[in-house]
Amino acid sequence: MSLTRLLIRDFRNIETADLALSPGFNFLVGANGSGKTSMLEAIYTLGHGRAFRSLQIGRVIRHEQEAFVLHGRLQGEERETAIGLTKDKQGDSKVRIDGTDGHKVAELAHLMPMQLITPEGFTLLNGGPKYRRAFLDWGCFHNESGFFTAWSNLKRLLKQRNAALRQVTRYEQLRPWDKELILLAEQISTWRAEYSAGIAADMADTCKQFLPEFSLTFSFQRGWEKETEYAEVLERNFERDRQLTYTAHGPHKADLRIRADGAPVEDTLSRGQLKLLMCALRLAQGEFLTRESGRRCLYLIDDFASELDDERRGLLASRLKATQSQVFVSAISAEHVIDMSDENSKMFTVEKGKITD
């Protein structure tokens, strides 16, 4: 699936843009603040219902406007799909697919699997566990049809349980929540464990190509003791959870621990090496999706030249081309991306929110 057409209206500093896109590489070139990251963010938002630079909707809608509008056309092997997203200052969204309203943002995410690589993406490696849980959950979402419903129900139950912890005095009062919570926790943890085991070889092989000087290991931690049933953990920790007023153990505390030569990667790797590792993990995840489902990711890469020397940029470019996926790359200068260009590429110039090809 590739995005063949993109319409942007009143998003960030882009008043309007109507763009025909390449199914291969699309380069966005312009000075800092020109709007090239805004175009990447518009594509991301069309597939996620939210921006990646700000959760405040007022900052995403163009100044003095009431809403942004995004439309796209997706070309698959057998059919074309029209998609649209409108969001106003109150945060109300309207999702349209093939001319009909009432759809969910999750449907857009399923139609447009994408990988985002930005200068801020180091949080996957040196941020908290929630960023690595999101990495695993992206894979589970695209690999298991029941994952999103189970994950949504888990969040709801945890919120209810945490509220109940402020009121109950005996563990028996929590059993109605815990009965369903335990089933969901075990199912989600099983999916995460299976996904992390399945993608492990892809991550190891890709990381070895990008960082051959390190021995990298990946370890999934489910969020409670390995040999203990979750039901036992919840009951045993009731008094502590009640004092904390939240549930201290469970799938919401899971992590994917990544080590280089036995030490945490954030303590071992330089910024450039961390970016290479981040790129390797995103590539491995996209390639695993293609192999398992036949579907290809869309890659968004902001500030391509940042932290990478010529050799590493060349390696990343060659691996991206090998995926045969659609790729959007922003850069300050065309010189940084010209070697990646071919007869199927498109080069867009971005200046003060105006996008031309």
Curated annotation (Swiss-Prot):
One of its GO terms (cellular component) is cytoplasm. Transmembrane segments: none annotated. The lineage of its organism: Bacteria, Pseudomonadati, Pseudomonadota, Gammaproteobacteria, Enterobacterales. Keywords: ATP-binding, Cytoplasm, DNA damage, DNA repair, DNA replication, DNA-binding, Nucleotide-binding, SOS response. ATP binds at G30, A31, N32, G33, S34, G35, K36, T37. GO terms for biological process: DNA replication; DNA synthesis involved in DNA repair; double-strand break repair; SOS response. GO terms for molecular function: ATP binding; single-stranded DNA binding. The RecF protein is involved in DNA metabolism; it is required for DNA replication and normal SOS inducibility. RecF binds preferentially to single-stranded, linear DNA. It also seems to bind ATP. The gene is recF. It is found in: Cytoplasm. It comes from Shigella dysenteriae serotype 1 (strain Sd197). Belongs to the RecF family. It comes from the Bacteria. This is DNA replication and repair protein RecF.
